[in-house]
Amino acid sequence: MSRYLELLAASSQRVGSSLCVGIDPDPAHLSLEHAASVAGLREWVRILINATAQYAAAYKVNLAFFEAYGAEGVALAEEIRALTPAETPIIMDVKRGDIGNTVKAQARALFDALGADAVTASPYLGIGALAPLLERDDRFIYLLCRTSNPESAELQELRLTATEAAPEEELYLRVARLAAARPEALAGRIGLVAGATAGGAFIKLREV
């Protein structure tokens, strides 16, 4: 079992829950006081963490909402590691994906500067392009596979022709098949993002 999965399992056992708390400070759902400034946002984050720390097996941070506040917002995102219990894993929901040195920079930013234990990433430039993220054997990657947004079927359910290594199938199933074949998957360092609104997809994904 990978370090991340061990950390997550221990955290879940400690709090008696599998709850992952989203830190998604959408200004549309915050009070004016909390949305108006980074200081207000920091207070909202503190209240949320204090109210959920005894129940949360993990925290998922939507970094875009912090980036929208500029440099001070990103600095607040860096503080989240210190604000949450040290033994509770943090997932950075960033859906990153690029190539070469850009992914190396993303890995440093997410894992080192922000202290993420796991991140979400897009496989659509090729899973191998994410090597700098995958090479961190103490971290975990959730690959976008079958997402819950209404537009997802436009690409994710496209039928692909069969190859020597795979049958004819939808694109999201091919992503899952390619991910499962990676050595990082065997080491417990790759997971999939599959939206709960696509219940039928779960059955197919478990068969891959």
Regions found by a protein language model. Name each.
Residues 1-89:
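Conserved N-terminal beta1-alpha1 strand-loop-helix module at the mouth
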Residues 89-97:
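Long, hydrophobic, well-ordered secondary-structure blocks that form the structural core
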Residues 44, 48, 76-80, 106, ...:
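A general structural detector for well-ordered alpha-helical segments in enzyme core domains, enriched
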Residues 177-181, 197-208:
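A short, acidic, amphipathic alpha-helical segment used as a generic capping/interface helix at domain edges
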Residues 68-83, 99-105, 124-138, 199-206:
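Active-site-adjacent beta->alpha loops and helix N-cap segments on the catalytic face
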Residues 26-27, 32, 98-193:
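Conserved anion-binding
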Residues 23, 92, 121:
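Active-site flanking residues adjacent to catalytic metal/cofactor-binding acidic residues
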Residues 85-88, 182-187, 208:
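Short helix-capping segments at alpha-helix termini
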